[in-house]
Amino acid sequence: MSKSKCSVGLMSSVVAPAKEPNAMGPKEVELILVKEQNGVQLTSSTLTNPRQSPVEAQDRETWGKKIDFLLSVIGFAVDLANVWRFPYLCYKNGGGAFLVPYLLFMVIAGMPLFYMELALGQFNREGAAGVWKICPVLKGVGFTVILISLYVGFFYNVIIAWALHYLFSSFTTELPWIHCNNSWNSPNCSDAHSGDSGGNGPGLNDTFGTTPAAEYFERGVLHLHQSHGIDDLGPPRWQLTACLVLVIVLLYFSLWKGVKTSGKVVWITATMPYVVLTALLLRGVTLPGAIDGIRAYLSVDFYRLCEASVWIDAATQVCFSLGVGFGVLIAFSSYNKFTNNCYRDAIVTTSINSLTSFSSGFVVFSFLGYMAQKHSVPIGDVAKDGPGLIFIIYPEAIATLPLSSAWAVVFFIMLLTLGIDSAMGGMESVITGLIDEFQLLHRHRELFTLFIVLATFLLSLFCVTNGGIYVFTLLDHFAAGTSILFGVLIEAIGVAWFYGVGQFSDDIQQMTGQRPSLYWRLCWKLVSPCFLLFVVVVSIVTFRPPHYGAYIFPDWANALGWVIATSSMAMVPIYAAYKFCSLPGSFREKLAYAIAPEKDRELVDRGEVRQFTLRHWLKV
């Protein structure tokens, strides 16, 4: 007996399909050929449904085009940290040698986790909370990542507002951070760089503490000199508030109609950075000292691989650079067609992310080499990470170029677009996660989106006060550090162990027609959870309180930071306790309903619980 499948349209001349008035979606004809002994072949045919989601009946929006989804994922994953953090870590940790642990962790943990989130969202077609129908007791993980994305929105939008402020300030014949003759400059400001002149007060980059660029950022934009600390914030600055309003308006109109609108916005925001990076690279490599900077970036010191800090930096960079754990990948992939090849998407997008991080290092260090030669200092004196790189050092380098205003406009447009699509992803995670969980919100998406963006705007106002940089630093340090690593760890355990890597692989095969290989199943089951556990433990053991330059945060501020961090992590045990207590029956029955997928409810009713068998936990 042999079986073959073909579409109804192609078989219309051979088989007349039965009509089903209420049938939804395309059908397939299954032909069964039976060869009898007399040589006569008889055929029978039946109509079968093609692969479809368990929730296919729901009227769920999908991406207008496949490229909309890919650009959205790439735009979210490739953010400002690709420009300001990876190149610095590579330089700091042995240059090209750093790529060894980075690529290793990317292959054994980063890609598998990325693939897992895409498949999880696409199969279940719900946001970060709704997907936990696969293990109801762990739905708190969904609320953890939603809350983290909301926290990040409170301060991430401020970075975009800074970039917008710089962009507006660049439309002049002379950039405002070139000289020390402005109203915001202090008597200590000096156009001439001095390698040891930067110890006079707080700053992102002590070496550049008294340059016009540093004073423009800290005194002209932030007005940090008018604050004595986090307990002396002062009023919001109207210029930054206006920029923040523009950012919020842009985010709202990009998100209010769902992926149909955001999928079009990313055509600009996700592609523009690559155009600008290419232009900056072509300009940077022609500058004097650029080769020295690139040589410093790529210099290989394999002895550094013997240091634990190098491996720790590589592990944390992999975790944060891909954007797993924010619920964004789950939200985006939930709008895919059910049969979309999420495996290929995972490979393509993670590869593009890593290549972007690596190539941006050539752009950054060509300019840093130029700055080092210009001021006759070692590259280590100008090689920094964080906001100081893109708002102090890079603007100062651009200011020395011919047509500096034009280059500044180009650079800050890149920062603006890098930030916008990442912020859109974070907001979409919150919106999709909650409207899928609460159907009342689903019917009023536009109003709920307005509520979310207004809430983030109001809380972001604390970050645009005179002392707002202290609030920004506190949130940046606590909101998405250990908490997001914890969330991803529980997520990996929930999918691979409680739901089962075998069942998860069956789901992927149902979608794509291809079962994940043993490599991916081993990574999900063993390697990725162990990797995440290692990173969580290391992040706790190596924790250092936040600081901004010479400013040390008071104890109450650090306590507030831990409240922020633990508030998101607490969603896991709080919801688990609520779910367990709300279920009827004995302890065993409660446990069965809590850890078994909702689709297995009938099996649980009959006492057939996969999770109560040893085979389930050992299966790979």
Swiss-Prot record:
Catalytic activity line of the entry: dopamine(out) + chloride(out) + Na(+)(out) = dopamine(in) + chloride(in) + Na(+)(in); (R)-noradrenaline(out) + chloride(out) + Na(+)(out) = (R)-noradrenaline(in) + chloride(in) + Na(+)(in); dopamine(out) + chloride(out) + 2 Na(+)(out) = dopamine(in) + chloride(in) + 2 Na(+)(in)
Q: Could you tell me the superkingdom of the organism this chain comes from?
A: Eukaryota
Q: Which residues of the sequence carry a binding annotation for dopamine?
A: 79, 149, 153, 320, 422-423
Which residue spans belong to the Cytoplasmic compartment? 1-56, 500-516, 584-620
Query: Where, in residue ranges, is this chain on the Extracellular side?
Result: 172-236, 288-306, 377-400, 543-553
Q: Does the keyword Disulfide bond apply?
A: yes
| Annotated stretches, region: Interaction with TGFB1I1 | 561-590
Q: Where in the cell is it found?
A: Cell membrane; Cell projection, Neuron projection; Cell projection, Axon
Q: How does it assemble?
A: Monomer. Homooligomer; disulfide-linked. Interacts with PRKCABP and TGFB1I1. Interacts (via N-terminus) with SYNGR3 (via N-terminus). Interacts with SLC18A2. Interacts with TOR1A (ATP-bound); TOR1A regulates SLC6A3 subcellular location. Interacts with alpha-synuclein/SNCA. Interacts with SEPTIN4.
For this entry, the protein name equals Sodium-dependent dopamine transporter
